[in-house]
A protein has these predicted regions:
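Intrinsically disordered, low-complexity Pro/Gly/Ser/Thr-rich segments with frequent PxxP/GP/PP motifs
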Residues: 4-56, 60-69
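Structured catalytic cores of large enzymes
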Residues: 38, 71-73, 93-118
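Mixed-charge (Asp/Glu-Lys/Arg
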Residues: 41, 49, 54, 70-75, ...
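Short beta-strand elements
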Residues: 65-100
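Secondary-structure boundary elements
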Residues: 104-176
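Hydrophobic/aromatic-rich core segments of domains that either
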Residues: 179-239
Length: 239
């Protein structure tokens, strides 16, 4: 039989409630693509998550106000600080580089004072003078500033690079004075980005560390699994 006044709704604890436009008639055997509803998260609810949660959302098909069909779909949600590792969207690691945090800004100020002691100039000019040594001096000042914080190193979880881990953000690392290799790497990357210096996070089995571009270039893609690329970039005469 033909269906009259058809609409679709979607909603759940972590999914925004939506309802499609009404289709006055859908003939038997015909197909209709409904594009004005989507699985959209409730951002505020997601930010409140502190642990992994298994939830669901419901899709219902109406004829007028009569429910013709109701289906529930499982939804696995992670806390906002969960990184899923290198096997699932590894490029999402970049979202944990947070150059605009106030704590990162304070580290820039501290590093600026150290840079003045080292070079006589306190300004972070990133790549403006075209001299790789200037970049090295700026990176050294930032490293020295972070080193003076006395942050304690703690080990990463086993196989973290494959299965991921909870990431302590830069401000929390500075507040708690502790972090593992990936968190310290992201902290350093955050401060570098705040002053305009390009960096890259290198992930190895059981470890992570930072690489810095000494000239104003960067890799065109967000991820690279070719070790020879790094080897060539680190060769003598290449910045």
């Amino acid at each position: 039989r033909s269906l009259l006044d058809i609409s679709v709704s979607i909603g759940g604890r972590f999914v925004q409630e939506q309802r499609s436009a009404i289709y006055s008639r859908i003939d038997r055997g015909s197909t209709v693509r409904i594009s004005d509803v989507a699985v959209l998260p409730k951002a505020d609810a997601l930010l409140e998550l502190s642990e992994r949660v298994i939830s669901s959302f419901t899709v219902q098909i109406y004829s007028g106000e009569e429910v013709l069909l109701s289906r529930e779909y499982d939804l696995e949600l992670m806390a906002f600080d969960q990184w899923l590792g290198t096997q699932i969207l590894p490029q999402c690691l970049a979202s944990f580089v947070v150059p605009n945090q106030p704590a990162v800004g304070r580290m820039v100020v501290k590093a600026s004072a150290l840079l003045k002691q080292m070079t006589g100039a306190s300004a972070f000019v990133e790549y403006q003078d075209g001299d790789p040594n200037t970049v090295v001096e700026q990176v050294s000042a930032i490293f020295a500033a972070l080193h003076q914080e006395g942050i304690i190193y703690r080990a990463v979880p086993a196989s973290y690079e494959a299965i991921g881990q909870r990431i302590t953000l830069a401000d929390q690392v500075l507040e708690s004075y502790q972090g593992n290799c990936i968190e310290l790497t992201l902290l350093m990357a955050s401060v570098l980005e705040a002053v305009g210096i390009n960096s890259g996070v290198v992930i190895m089995r059981g470890h992570a560390f930072l690489g810095v571009w000494l000239s104003e270039v960067c890799y065109r893609q967000s991820i690279c699994d070719d070790a020879s690329f790094l080897e060539k970039a680190c060769s003598d005469g290449i910045s």
